[in-house]
Amino acid sequence: MTTIGTPLRTNATKVMMLGSGELGKEVVIELQPLGVEVIAVDRYDNAPAQQVAHRAYTISMLDGNALRDLVEKEKPDFIVPEVEAIATATLVELEQEGYNVIPTAKATQLTMNREGIRRLAAEELGLKTSPYRFVDNFEQFQQAIQEIGIPCVVKPIMSSSGHGQSVIKSEADIQQAWDYSQQGGRAGGGRVIVEGFIKFDYEITQLTVRHIHGIVFSSHRHIQVDGDYRESWQPQQMSDIALKKAQETAEKITSALGGRGIFGVELFVCGDEIIFNEVSPRPHDTGIVTMASQELSQFALHARAILGLPIPEIYRISPAASKAIVVEGKSDNVRFGGVDKVLAEIGTNIRLFGKGEVNGHRRLGVILARDENTVRALETSRRAYDKLDIQL
């Protein structure tokens, strides 16, 4: 039997979010109606999840001592990493001391860099992946490109949302791709992965929820530009064979990582074949579409799994689509005009994340749309997006 205390009382059930972005914000919003006290932590003040949590702290989560001090001060029942840039060695120690890390400290440590998870998937589990090489310097980088061939994809081993990622289409791109990879990693310059370019039919995210009574799945299709999510929709028509292989692949990788919670497993679909790309042990940015398409969004599913609550089934309520609001420029005073026009479109909703500034390009919100099918839902989301007036 699961027992939940009362927030802001001595018997409170406490969740500490490590990372307080827009995905963490929605998890906080789902945890609070379940009676959970939430502490939101990030590297900068007033991050999205901090705006809705009971308490907020600003620290460098790569500082193991600062992270330990905060955990020992708050004594959370559950520690929930939402980003990669965390002192994972400290999480391993805390877990060994009895703290509950979601899904596990091992999962957080392995997935914080692409090398750990790629070697687990390809070399230990035997999952199909693109050909790859890991390199530490420009000389190795050139050799890897020669072995893999052009076109190929370059990514820092520690980055997200496309930062530092590029596609080499000709030899003229090599130097620029290396330089960009050294600027875009979460931990600065360093080791990168060079991957063979996969000719796929489409990409899906296989949301995989490990909960107290087993595993449930929910898949959706997405489009990325330079490694960053732009659109997603659900449902995505795919063959029964491909769907079964996608679920088997997702179950293998998430079972190896262990624990409870939601995982976003990125897969390439080539006919009936499935090729593993990446996995995140947390809600996935492309999964925001589930806020419109499912009775229980990915955030609600994660909240239930964290607390050890049952998930009998995932019920889909409507075809739906999401379109990311990506802003380019420089400003600390972003405003959104035309929100009334966006919401005048039947079946639409908008989520503005509350991020305080933009310097370059940054995802600041998302438009959601429901319709009778995914084609119409995508059209509605794009039409609504065009009515938004972003002011820097």
From Swiss-Prot:
Entry-linked PROSITE patterns: ATP_GRASP (PS50975)
Residues binding N(1)-(5-phospho-beta-D-ribosyl)glycinamide, per UniProt: 22-23, 82, 285, 355, 362-363
EC number(s) reported in the record: 6.3.1.21
Residues engaged in binding Mg(2+): 266, 278
Residue intervals of the ATP-grasp domain: 119-307
Gene Ontology cellular component annotations, sorted alphabetically: cytosol; plasma membrane
A Pfam family that the UniProt record links to this protein: ATP-grasp
Catalytic activity: N(1)-(5-phospho-beta-D-ribosyl)glycinamide + formate + ATP = N(2)-formyl-N(1)-(5-phospho-beta-D-ribosyl)glycinamide + ADP + phosphate + H(+)
Enzyme class, UniProt record, top EC level: ligase
Membrane topology summary: Peripheral membrane protein
Listed pathway(s): Purine metabolism; IMP biosynthesis via de novo pathway; N(2)-formyl-N(1)-(5-phospho-D-ribosyl)glycinamide from N(1)-(5-phospho-D-ribosyl)glycinamide (formate route): step 1/1
Binding site for ATP: 114, 155, 160-165, 195-198, 203
Domain of life: Bacteria
Intracellular or extracellular location(s): Cell inner membrane
GO MF term (any one): phosphoribosylglycinamide formyltransferase activity
Functional note: Involved in the de novo purine biosynthesis. Catalyzes the transfer of formate to 5-phospho-ribosyl-glycinamide (GAR), producing 5-phospho-ribosyl-N-formylglycinamide (FGAR). Formate is provided by PurU via hydrolysis of 10-formyl-tetrahydrofolate.
Family, as annotated: Belongs to the PurK/PurT family.
PANTHER family: FORMATE-DEPENDENT PHOSPHORIBOSYLGLYCINAMIDE FORMYLTRANSFERASE (PTHR43055:SF1)
Matches recorded under HAMAP family: PurT (MF_01643)
Subunit and interaction comment: Homodimer.
Protein name: Formate-dependent phosphoribosylglycinamide formyltransferase
Gene name of this polypeptide: purT
